[in-house]
Regions:
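A general secondary-structure junction signal
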Residues: 48-50, 99, 198-200, 447-449, ...
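A carboxyl-terminal module marker
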Residues: 680, 684-705, 744, 748-750
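Short basic, glycine-rich beta-strand/loop surfaces that mediate nucleic-acid
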Residues: 704-716
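Inter-lobe coupling/hinge segments of SF2-like helicase ATPases
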Residues: 210-216, 220-223, 232-672, 680-681, ...
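Accessory, non-ATPase domains that flank or precede helicase/AAA+ motor cores in DNA-metabolism machines
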Residues: 1-374, 381, 386-402, 685, ...
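Short secondary-structure junctions
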Residues: 524-527, 682-690, 735-740
Length: 751
């Protein structure tokens, strides 16, 4: 009976059916090479095998199977299907992020489509020949070699001393013998003294005896609470103030799972955090720790995926959001550190998934548990914990002898009126910086805007430099002497004359991290100043160098964007300055207050890791703003109550589920007709739950105009039914000849 296979390709298309050649064995989850179109060859994943011939005259056949074993387990396939359904994309789009790029080769001819590049690496291993396990014959070999071939004698002695039957990589032997080369080993093999063989490179997993950190009574209580709650609930929140020692609790739970032979996934929001965390975890768990992030080479990510796919358990992966797609077959625990961080949400391309939410579903599919950790949890997670859907454990005391920082709120308007403001710094902050530097301590300054200035302006006529492709001003980067669009990357030189009125008075306005760095170097000429933002960090090496210098106290003042807020632990920092809290609060987003609170508390936490406390200065023109007061008091509960009351009144998450639809096209008139038509269609289905059409703050990017619609559905309603209805309307819209070329981006649970 002829067989057919539904194949998922890395395209925004549904699965396609191919014939299975006679004699070829394929099964669900396997990778195969197929021809799609006239000449294009792709890697695909077998989704199901059946005997139903599709209604086509010609059915193309699978070219070949690319791996022996399936790349996806049944659980992974169910997870991919959930991601595709929930985030309204295709399994092929999930495949784009779910597999490393070397595992998805494509080419215009079958000859270009080679497996060689993604075969696992092998190493050459050597061992004593079986005959030399007899002591007499081994002694005879030593006597022959000691005078005639001393280097061969030393190599054989080294191998024999490694233990009976021990296999050693040739590279390790060469390192131990310093000047020994492969010729020595080849000579020993020709004489029959050793044997060699190639085998796949593996990672030594080590034992289960870990040197775990001691826990305080508060941490022990939290650990016991989590153990009990995991017996009843699939997920729990560990709510611990900054510096309370959440990581130590993670470590004990991780050790328990690894000791049982289970797999653990520890998610962090930023690549920047992985290096410090991996180093810390390796001190405890050794070679069991496997990093996974985009800064690793394609080859390394592929090797990691293939090794994990063969593993039978006991794996510990530390990685960023894409790590949720790794093949951890015995997954028992997923830890999501800083669960509130918006970096867990993928913006583009599809699937626009939130790794935190996916982790909860993923662990449930595997029968495992999810631990969400944060000092300032997202309000969605906070409500889930408060309602009993998730478990909840709290850490309200700081770990060790650390004291919370003292927070000062400095009014920028009052300081300016009193003549107590110099450049972009109030006198209060400058005085405290001088005192801290005088004591040999370090300072961190946070400004949530990179570049030298947000824009340049003509003082005479008000002209500003704007991007020709996007509806935004160009940011001035003094270091490169150019204007840059942070949306499309367009660059332009700074004009000498105003293009509008020809006056030579074009000046930068506002301030970014570059300008802060320059002004601080002028105000504190003896201080060593460094900057940490996307412009200064051009590579992982550059990032590590900046962090290492600050950690070693080779830098006195570190200026940076959000990158400096993410979980770093610098013992020398006694003062943190938040230079402009206003631009955190004044965003047109219902999450602005929550995000501002979270970010300022994170920044403040960098000064709260000392036995003598620390100090934080918040500069703002609105010292009486409720969020500023809540940050100064460390009042998360107060912030949560106030924001939840507003969300409930205006029907926003967690009391509603949002889906943002963004339409894009170069013809603004066509776009307006399209958005009006789609809004009418959706209102016919959802009524007043549809908001818009809306014009986003940046309504043109890369030459395309943008318009939006927001769908709000009650959190208690069936989200699956809402997606089904929405999908049907979007399909009908895309099939309309007038609007078929309009791009519709679907963003479920936008952040």
């Amino acid at each position: 009976m002829p067989l057919y296979a539904d194949i998922v390709l890395p395209l925004a298309q549904p699965a396609y059916t191919f014939a299975v050649p006679e004699g070829m064995h394929v099964e669900a989850g396997q990778a195969v090479a197929v021809q799609f179109g006239a000449r294009k060859f792709y890697t695909g994943i077998v989704w199901r095998v059946h005997d139903r011939r599709p209604p086509f005259k010609t059915v193309k056949s699978i070219q070949r199977v690319l791996y022996g074993a399936p790349l996806l387990s049944a659980q992974q396939m169910a997870f991919w299907e959930w991601v595709a359904a929930y985030y309204m994309c295709t399994p092929g789009e999930v495949m784009r992020v779910g597999l490393p790029s070397l595992m998805k080769p494509s080419g215009d001819t079958e000859e270009e489509f080679t497996e060689e590049e993604f075969r696992p690496r092998t190493e050459c291993y050597v061992a004593l020949a079986p005959g030399l396990h007899d002591e007499g014959r081994l002694h005879e070999a030593f006597e022959k070699l000691e005078r005639r071939a001393p280097r061969q004698y030393e190599a054989l002695l080294e191998l024999a001393s490694a233990g009976d039957g021990e296999r050693i990589p040739t590279g390790e032997v060469a390192r131990r013998l310093l000047r020994a080369d492969y010729a020595v080993l080849h000579a020993l093999e020709r004489k029959g003294y050793i044997v060699s063989a190639e085998r796949e490179r593996t990672v030594e997993r080590g034992g289960s005896a870990f040197r775990l950190p001691e826990l305080t009574p508060a941490q022990l209580a939290a650990l016991e609470s989590l153990r009990g709650q995991f017996a009843r609930k699939p997920a729990a929140l560990l709510h611990g103030i900054t510096g309370s020692g959440k990581t130590e609790v993670y470590i004990h739970l991780i050790a328990e799972v690894l000791a049982r032979g289970g797999d653990v996934l520890l998610l962090v929001p930023e690549i920047a955090l992985t290096a410090q965390l991996i180093e810390r975890m390796e001190r405890i768990f050794g070679s069991r720790v496997t990093p996974y992030h985009s800064k690793l080479t394609n080859r390394r990510r592929t090797e990691t995926y293939l090794r994990l796919n063969r593993s039978q358990g006991g794996e510990f992966v530390v990685g960023v959001r894409s790590s949720i797609f790794l093949p951890l077959k015995r997954l028992q625990l997923v830890v999501v550190d800083e669960e509130h961080d918006a970096s867990y949400k993928q913006a583009d391309p599809a699937p626009r998934y939130n790794a935190r939410d996916c982790a909860v579903v993923m662990a449930r599919l595997w029968g495992g548990r999810t631990l969400l950790g944060s000092a300032t949890p997202s309000l969605e997670t906070w409500v889930n914990a408060g309602s009993g859907k998730y478990g909840l454990a709290s850490l309200t005391e700081r770990y060790g002898d650390a004291w919370p920082p003292e927070i000062f709120v400095s009014d920028t308007i009052r300081a300016a009126k009193r003549g107590e403001r110099h450049a972009h710094f109030n006198k209060l902050l400058l005085d405290k910086m001088e005192a801290a530097l005088g004591r040999g301590e370090q300072v961190m300054l946070f400004q949530n805007r990179r570049g030298f200035a947000p824009y340049v302006e003509c003082s005479e006529c008000g002209w500003t430099a704007r991007c020709p492709h996007c509806n935004v001003t160009l940011t001035y980067h003094k270091g490169g002497g150019k204007l840059v669009c942070h949306y499309c990357g367009y660059t332009a030189p700074v004009p000498v004359k105003c293009p509008s009125c020809k006056v030579t008075d074009v000046v930068p306005r506002g301030f970014g991290t570059e300008k802060v760095e320059e002004e601080i170097a002028r105000l504190f000429p003896a201080a060593r100043v460094a900057r940490l933002d996307r412009d200064s960090v051009t590579s992982e090496r550059a990032f590590n160098a900046i962090i290492a210098d600050f950690e070693a106290r080779k830098t006195d003042i570190l200026v940076g964007t959000q990158m400096i807020t993410k979980g770093f632990d610098f013992g020398g920092v006694s003062l943190v300055g938040i230079l402009n809290a206003d631009n955190l609060l004044n965003n047109p987003d219902f999450r602005a207050a929550e995000r501002a609170f979270q970010l300022m508390m994170q920044v403040a936490g960098r000064a709260g890791r000392r036995s003598d406390g620390g100090e934080v200065v918040i500069q703002t023109s609105e010292p009486g703003h409720p969020v500023i007061r809540q940050v100064a008091a460390g009042d998360y509960d107060g912030m949560a109550r106030a924001q939840l009351a507003e969300r409930e009144a205006f029907f926003y998450p967690p009391y509603a589920r949002l889906t943002l639809l963004t339409l894009r096209h170069r013809d603004v008139a066509l776009l307006r007709r399209g958005i009006t038509e789609l809004a009418a269609r959706l209102r016919g289905r959802f009524g007043r739950r549809v908001l818009g059409p809306m014009t986003p703050p940046v309504d043109r990017i890369r030459g395309e105009y943008l318009a939006g619609l927001l769908l709000k559905v009650e959190s208690g309603a069936s989200s699956a039914r809402a997606r089904e209805l929405l999908g049907a309307e979007l399909k009908a819209f895309s099939e309309d000849p007038e609007f078929r070329n309009i791009t519709v981006v679907v963003n479920v649970d936008p952040q």
